[in-house]
């Protein structure tokens, strides 16, 4: 059984203080860092995970500054966890490929050293395929607890995916505040998400 936590990144600077972002940064528009408060509540989220008995072997993160910073703060609570940058956890890119600090020419679309069929910009349907592909692969590659730090749009897509599997569940994907956490257990023997384990925590 693999326990999975998919977490939206913490509070981003450009939405909270756009003028400061414009004056002091203003280069990679898609790659805002966190606010000071964002760092604090990300670490708090890590402590809450630990207090619940969760102990991830791997913490996977999208390659954006805000997701990597969130993952790094969570990792301070789990010093034995391994932090892994996973390209395909990237934000939805419908109009143009995002240029970010780590990849100023655009984010790669490889998985496990191999090129995939995905590219940017992308349609909504290809984005859904990408989300389902990468989360499936990360679960396949693990037998212990994992954390996935990513973006609100990706979280919404995967919540809708679970809703399509279990229509009787009442899952709300319309709004995903900072650090929204989707939790579930995956039974690898039966190759399925355990319905009773699905939970969304909107608190931060």
Swiss-Prot record:
It holds the Pfam family His_Phos_1. InterPro entries: His_Pase_superF_clade-1, His_PPase_superfam, Phosphatase_SH3-domain. Signal peptide: none annotated. The record marks 151 as: Transition state stabilizer. It comes from the Viruses. The active site is at 9 (tele-phosphohistidine intermediate), 86 (proton donor/acceptor). PANTHER family: UBIQUITIN-ASSOCIATED AND SH3 DOMAIN-CONTAINING BA-RELATED. Belongs to the phosphoglycerate mutase family. This is Uncharacterized phosphoglycerate mutase family protein R708. It comes from Acanthamoeba polyphaga mimivirus (APMV).
């Amino acid at each position: 059984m693999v326990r999975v936590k998919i977490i939206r990144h913490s509070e981003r600077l450009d939405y909270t203080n756009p003028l400061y972002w414009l004056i002091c940064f203003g280069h990679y528009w898609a790659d805002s860092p966190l606010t000071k408060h964002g760092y604090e509540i990300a670490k708090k989220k890590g402590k809450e995970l630990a207090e619940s008995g969760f102990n991830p072997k791997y913490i996977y993160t999208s390659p954006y500054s805000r997701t990597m910073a969130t993952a790094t703060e969570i990792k301070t609570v789990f010093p034995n966890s391994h932090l892994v940058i996973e390209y395909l956890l990237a934000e939805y890119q419908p109009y143009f490929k995002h240029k970010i600090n780590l990849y100023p020419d655009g984010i790669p679309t490889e998985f496990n050293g191999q090129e995939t069929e995905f590219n940017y910009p992308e349609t909504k349907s290809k984005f859904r395929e990408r989300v389902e592909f990468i989360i499936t692969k990360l679960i396949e590659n693990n037998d212990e607890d994992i954390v996935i730090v990513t973006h609100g749009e990706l979280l919404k897509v995967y919540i809708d995916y679970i809703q399509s599997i279990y229509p009787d569940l009442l899952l709300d994907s319309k709004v995903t505040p900072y650090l929204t956490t989707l939790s579930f257990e995956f039974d690898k023997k039966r190759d399925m998400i355990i319905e009773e384990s699905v939970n969304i925590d909107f608190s931060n």
